[in-house]
Amino acid sequence: MNKEVEVRNLGIKDYKETWDYQENIFKETVDLKIKNRREGTEIPTRNYFLFVEHPHVYTLGKSGDAENLLISEKELKAKNATFYKINRGGDITYHGPGQIVGYPILDLDNFFTDIHKYLRLLEEAVILTLSEYGLKSERSPGETGVWLDVGTPFARKICAMGVRASRWVTMHGFALNVNADLGYFDNIIPCGIKGKAVTSLNVELGQKEINLEEVQEKLLKHFQELFQAELKYQ
């Protein structure tokens, strides 16, 4: 089993361009697994962890409701935002500057074949990262992602998640609000969940801006420990 994970920082990149990039890696990995099974070979698959910041964009998962986008195409353009229907799980979410967006493209045959465990460990990596900033975050029953003050009228989401998997290969991932402009969430019903607020790390800490690279380093440390991975930086 290959537990090496190649970490790639893509910088600020258009959503569609990044999605295509993910799809190419995903397809190569799935195709190699099919070839190995068909030909009886054991060529190792590779694992990747992509990090990116997107320009303002809304994405709707395959089980989502387009009615959860609350603005018109004209209003989208006025806000310099785009909209895509995509092939991950979940409903609608927002990506933009000030978020850490992570796309692990892993062959879970290299780790464990359990999608539920995969999602819970991704959540745990975020929870442990936020705890380093003194924030107590947690899961909300039946709602994937990471939240604060669950079970109270003040419950708010700080990290959204939505993934796709085929033949135990994953793509898509999570978006952690660090310095994000939360006003963009007013244009959607985030994750299709009415009456729940969103927040970001800088708002919770009362700081103007938090270093994204520092947060990413902490997150990768916890990911490495939880997945027992070997990180390789590109």
Swiss-Prot record:
Annotated positions binding substrate: 88-95, 160-162, 173-175
UniProt-annotated catalytic positions: 191 (acyl-thioester intermediate)
BPL/LPL catalytic domain sequence ranges: 43-231
SUPFAM superfamilies: Class II aaRS and biotin synthetases
EC main group: transferase
Site features described as Lowers pKa of active site Cys, chain residue numbers: 157
Biochemical pathway: Protein modification; protein lipoylation via endogenous pathway; protein N(6)-(lipoyl)lysine from octanoyl-[acyl-carrier-protein]: step 1/2
Function as written in the Swiss-Prot or TrEMBL entry: Catalyzes the transfer of endogenously produced octanoic acid from octanoyl-acyl-carrier-protein onto the lipoyl domains of lipoate-dependent enzymes. Lipoyl-ACP can also act as a substrate although octanoyl-ACP is likely to be the physiological substrate.
Family to which this protein belongs: Belongs to the LipB family.
Name of the molecule in the record: Octanoyltransferase
Organism: Christiangramia forsetii (strain DSM 17595 / CGMCC 1.15422 / KT0803) (Gramella forsetii)
